[in-house]
Amino acid sequence: MTSSTEIHTGDIGEALCYYRLLQMGVPCRIVNLGATDILAILDDDVVIRVQVKTAHQTFDPRYKNRSAFYGFNVCRGSKEKRRFLEHEIDVFACVGLEDEAIIFYQAKHLLQKKTHKVKAHLFSDSGVTQDSWSKAIKPLLYT
C-alpha cells in the first residue's frame, strides 16, 4: 500500500511540474488518466503525455564522498513494479523537491529502467527545467 507521505510527495511534484510548464508558456492540465499525470498541448495539435516522478534528495551512506542525489522510481505500482510501455507516455518529468526543479526526459530513454538516479547538483542549474523540456519534446514535434 502506498503511504500518505508518498501520495503527498507525488501531488506536490505534479503541482510543481504543472506550475513550471505554465510558467514556460506550455498549455497543460493535470489529468491523472492511466499512465498520464499531465497533458501538454503544443502548437494546438501535438499532445504530450507526461508522467511525473518526484523524489527527495538523499545520500548514499556506502561512500565517503556522499554527494547528494535524487532517486526516482520510474515504473508503476507500489508493491509489484511494472515498467511503463512506450505507447503510454511521451515524457518523464523527474521533480527534485528540494531544488524545486525538473529534469524532463523522453520516455523511451527511461522505459527499460525501474529506478533512475540523478546527481542533485544537476537540478541547481537555473535553466535545467526549460532546457530539458525543449530537448525532451523536440523529437516529438518533428515525427
Identify the role of each PLM range.
Residues 1-34, 40-143:
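Mixed-charge (Asp/Glu-Lys/Arg
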